[in-house]
A protein has these predicted regions:
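Short, solvent-exposed loop/turn segments that connect beta-strands within catalytic domains
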Residues: 152-154, 200-206
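Active-site catalytic microenvironments in core metabolic enzymes, especially phosphate/sugar-handling
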Residues: 208-212
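Short beta-strand scaffold segments in enzyme catalytic cores
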Residues: 193-197
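Short acidic (Asp/Glu) patches
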Residues: 171-183, 188-192
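Short, surface-exposed beta-edge/turn micro-motifs
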Residues: 191-192, 205-207
Length: 407
C-alpha cells in the first residue's frame, strides 16, 4: 500500500503512513456500526519499536480548520446543544475500565500464549459500548454529534480527538516537544483523550473541549483573548470535605497546548496538578496507544454518573500483587462506601449474604443486567489470584511509567 493513500485524515505527523486502525471488527454490531466507521475513518495503528512498551502515538499532519460562527448567540446555541449530548452520554454510559481488563485476561488465557507482552503487542483493544473508557466515551460523543448537522452543517468534520498527558512537572520542556514530535513520541504515553472543536466567533478564536472520561458535564470553552465565553475555573466535584476545581487555558508557553489545571482542596490543604492537551493536530492513535495503555494501568473502576457528572455507584480497586480488596459505593440515604474482599465472594452464602445484598443494590444503580456485577467481581478475583499474569501485566505498566518518567 502506498503512503498517503488513506487521505488527509490519516496523514501522519512525525512518521511514515500506516493503515487505518481495523482491529476488533467482530465486536461491532449493526447498532454501533457508525461508531466502528468513525474509528476506521479517524484512527490508525502506530508503529511499534522492538522492546518499546507501547506503539508510538501519531497525529495528523493537517490541522483542523476553525468552525465559523456568526455571533455569540450562534456559539451559545451550539454549546448548549453539545452540552445536552454530553450530559445524556454521562447518564447513559458507565465509565468502565474493568470490562476490557477482564476481556484481555480471558483472551490471553484462551490463546495459550505464556508471554504476556508478546500477546499484548498483537492484541487489538476493543471499543464497545458496555466498556467505555475516556477513548470510547469521546468517540461515542463524536458519533452522536452528527445529529447537529442539520442546524450546524459540517460540524462533524471539524471535530477531532486530542491527546493529553496528565501530571506534567516540566511544562516548558514538554511544550517544546511540539516541534519534534517524531522523536519525542518515544517518551509519551498519552493516557487521556478529549473531544475538541476549533472555532471562530467573527475573528475571535477559541476551542471547545468535551471530557466525558473525567465526568465533566459541561462544555469547556477556551478563548484566545480569555474573554467571554471563556469558561475559566469551575468546581468539578465537592464531596466529603474534598473540593476539586478545573481550569483549561491556552498554555502561555506554547499555544499548541492547553493547560488543564486541577486544584484539589482536602480539609483546607490544597494540591495542584497540571496536564497538557496537544490541540494543534488531531490525534490518530487513541485506540492503539491510549486505550492500549489503559489496559495495563494499575487502577480500575466501573462507575455510573448522573447528568451533572456526579458519581452514583460503582466499584474500584488497585491492581497489585497480593491484593484482595475492592471498594464498592452506592446510594442509600446518601452515599455509602465500604471495602470488601474478592475472596469473600467465594465463601458460603451465610458468610457473604450481606455483601451480596450490597452488590445487588450497586448492580441496579450501575444499570447492569441482574447478577452482572457479581459475575464481574468473581472474574476479577480469578485474575487477581493469577500471580504469573499479574506480575507480567504490572511489569508492562512499570515499563510505561519509566518511559514517561521525565515528563
Amino acid at each position: 500500500v502506498q503512503a498517503g493513500s488513506w487521505g488527509p485524515d490519516c496523514a501522519l505527523l512525525g512518521g511514515p503512513a500506516v493503515p487505518p486502525f481495523v482491529g476488533a471488527y467482530d465486536i461491532f454490531t449493526n447498532n454501533n456500526a457508525d461508531l466502528y466507521e468513525l474509528i476506521e475513518r479517524t484512527q490508525i495503528e502506530g508503529s511499534w519499536p522492538i522492546d518499546h512498551p507501547l506503539p508510538l502515538p501519531r497525529w495528523s499532519c493537517k490541522s483542523k480548520n476553525c468552525y465559523q460562527l456568526e455571533s455569540l448567540t450562534h456559539f451559545e446555541n451550539l454549546a448548549a446543544k453539545i452540552e445536552l449530548h454530553v450530559q445524556k452520554l454521562l447518564e447513559e454510559h458507565n465509565y468502565n475500565t474493568v470490562g476490557n481488563f477482564i476481556d484481555l485476561y480471558q483472551n490471553f488465557k484462551k490463546s495459550g500464549c505464556c508471554n504476556f507482552f508478546k500477546y499484548f503487542q498483537s492484541y487489538a483493544p476493543p471499543i464497545t459500548p458496555a466498556h467505555h473508557t475516556c477513548v470510547g466515551l469521546a468517540l461515542e460523543l463524536w458519533n452522536r454529534l452528527h445529529h447537529l448537522e442539520l442546524s450546524f452543517p459540517g460540524i462533524s468534520q471539524h471535530l477531532c480527538l486530542v491527546s493529553c498527558e496528565e501530571n506534567i512537572e516540566a511544562l516548558s520542556e514538554y511544550t517544546a516537544l511540539s516541534e519534534r514530535l517524531d522523536t519525542a513520541a518515544y517518551d509519551l504515553e498519552k493516557e487521556h483523550v478529549l473531544l475538541c472543536l476549533k472555532f471562530k466567533i467573527n475573528e475571535r478564536q477559541g476551542l471547545l473541549l468535551c471530557d466525558p472520561g473525567y465526568h465533566v458535564s459541561r462544555v469547556v470553552t477556551i478563548m484566545q483573548d480569555r474573554a467571554y465565553p471563556n469558561t475559566g475555573w469551575f468546581i468539578q466535584s465537592e464531596e466529603n470535605n474534598i473540593c476539586k476545581e478545573y481550569n483549561y487555558q491556552f498554555s502561555p508557553l506554547n499555544d499548541k497546548f492547553v493547560e488543564w489545571n486541577e486544584r484539589t482542596t482536602r480539609n483546607g490543604i490544597q494540591e495542584t496538578f497540571t496536564g497538557l492537551i496537544y490541540v494543534a493536530h488531531p490525534y490518530l492513535t487513541a485506540v492503539d496507544v491510549t486505550e492500549r495503555r489503559n489496559l495495563v494501568y494499575n487502577f480500575r473502576s466501573l462507575l455510573s454518573r448522573d447528568q451533572k457528572g456526579h458519581l452514583i455507584a460503582g466499584v474500584y480497586f488497585k491492581v497489585k500483587e497480593n491484593c484482595d480488596e475492592f471498594t464498592i459505593f452506592y446510594q442509600d440515604m446518601g452515599k455509602q462506601r465500604m471495602k470488601m474482599k474478592f475472596s469473600t465472594l467465594n465463601e458460603p452464602f451465610q458468610v457473604k449474604e450481606k455483601a451480596l445484598n450490597i452488590i445487588t443494590i450497586c448492580n441496579e444503580q450501575l444499570n447492569l443486567p441482574e447478577g452482572s456485577l457479581l459475575d464481574i467481581l468473581l472474574q476479577v478475583g480469578d485474575l487477581m489470584r493469577d500471580k504469573s499474569y499479574l506480575r507480567q501485566l504490572l511489569d508492562v505498566n512499570q515499563s510505561i511509567n519509566i518511559m514517561s518518567a521525565n515528563n
